[in-house]
A protein has these predicted regions:
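Short, acidic/polar
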Residues: 42, 98-108, 167-169
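N-terminal pre-triad scaffold of radical SAM enzymes
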Residues: 1-25, 50-62, 245-250
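SEC14/CRAL-TRIO lipid-binding/transfer domains and related phosphoinositide-recognition modules
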Residues: 11-12, 36, 40, 44, ...
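Core AdoMet radical
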Residues: 6, 26-38, 52-68, 81-100, ...
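Radical SAM enzyme [4Fe-4S]-AdoMet core and its adjacent flexible, acidic
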Residues: 31-33, 122, 130-142, 146-275, ...
């Protein structure tokens, strides 16, 4: 297993929604540290990497909302380090803005170098607002989309597909396919608050009932039944990204370690976790239910299998796959 990149994560950005499937289980409180302290640490780490491990990529990341207290400073740093956030921002959970305010803000975003924004729609207006936990969120996102396009900013729109919004997909796809956006449909995960959606997952029959137009935006290769994953398993992973999550509970300990020791500690955690918990392909052989017709992404199904394996074997282990905390991502 080869470490390919280092990800510095500081979840200090407030989100103004309370979505039903929030990966980060946002509850109104940020868990990161103040920006200046995080950026100073990230800058020092990046400088050390360039001098000592130039083969490793580097990313600075602050979560799924762009309401960063020092957004433009963060964008500049992300551009300096070739982090994705230097050109791409996720716009879910933003604070309310009028259309004029959105125009001014998005114009600033564009001038700062942002080329692409991402928006998530859960359904038509009433359903979307209930799912997002905020009245008016649908109209805010739609206004954001229209203003961004008028300014020449590229927009991608994702729609998580569950049983509850199946009857809304034709209208949604018809709406967004007429706009100049990159549209994609996907099955939501069962991680974080997403575990509450497990009974709402769509089946193969649900997929077959979709119109051809809707199917055009849904990637069946990445959303399969358990038997389909078993019958055509993915290649085994060989690379990993190490994530350093900066929290009030760990920042002093992290700052007191050398950068090399931080990397070594995370690699040891990674090795221990994956020598204890089998790979996705191994768990497929052990657990795949050939009669289950639900559709899963690999990320979702592997999370379900890992949880089952850990519980069945009564294993006490730190979950290094929890994307809120320090850990690793294998790919």
């Amino acid at each position: 297993m080869k470490t390919k990149s280092i990800n510095i994560l500081n979840l200090n950005v407030p989100c103004h929604c309370h979505c039903r499937y929030c990966l980060l289980e946002w509850n109104g409180k940020t868990i990161g540290i103040d920006y200046d302290r995080s950026i100073n640490y990230a800058k020092s780490f990046y400088k050390w990497l360039k001098e000592n491990k130039p083969e490793l990529n580097f990313t600075y990341y602050f979560g799924y909302s762009m309401e960063h207290p020092k957004l433009f400073e963060a964008i500049k740093f992300m551009q300096e380090t070739n982090s994705p956030g230097g050109e791409f921002l996720q716009f879910d959970g933003m604070k309310e803005r009028t259309k004029d305010e959105l125009f001014d803000f998005l114009a600033e975003i564009k001038n700062a170098g942002i080329k692409l924004i991402d928006l998530t729609f859960y359904g038509l207006e009433d359903y979307h607002d209930k799912f997002a936990g905020r009245l008016g969120d649908y109209n805010l996102l739609m206004n954001t989309l229209d203003v961004a396009l008028s300014l020449g900013i590229n927009v991608e729109v994702g729609i998580p597909v569950i049983k509850e919004n199946l009857d809304q997909l034709n209208e949604l796809v018809d709406l967004f396919s007429k706009k100049n956006v990159n549209l994609f449909l996907f099955t939501p995960h069962s991680i974080g608050r997403g575990k509450t959606l497990i009974n709402s997952k769509i089946t193969l029959d649900d997929y077959e009932s979709m119109s051809k137009n809707v199917k055009n935006y849904f990637n069946r290769n990445t959303n399969r039944t358990q038997y389909e994953w078993l019958n055509n398993p993915p290649k085994e992973v060989s690379n990993r990204t190490l994530t350093i999550s900066l929290l009030s509970t760990n920042i002093e300990d992290i700052e007191n370690k050398t950068f090399e020791d931080v990397i070594k500690e995370l690699e040891e955690m990674d090795y221990y976790f994956y020598s204890t918990v089998p790979s996705f392909n191994e768990l497929l052989i052990k657990y795949a239910d050939k009669n289950d017709k639900l559709l899963y992404s690999k990320k979702d199904l592997y999370a379900i299998y890992r949880k089952r394996y850990i519980q069945e074997n009564k294993i006490n282990i730190i979950d290094i796959t929890d994307e809120r905390y320090s850990g690793s991502i294998r790919y």
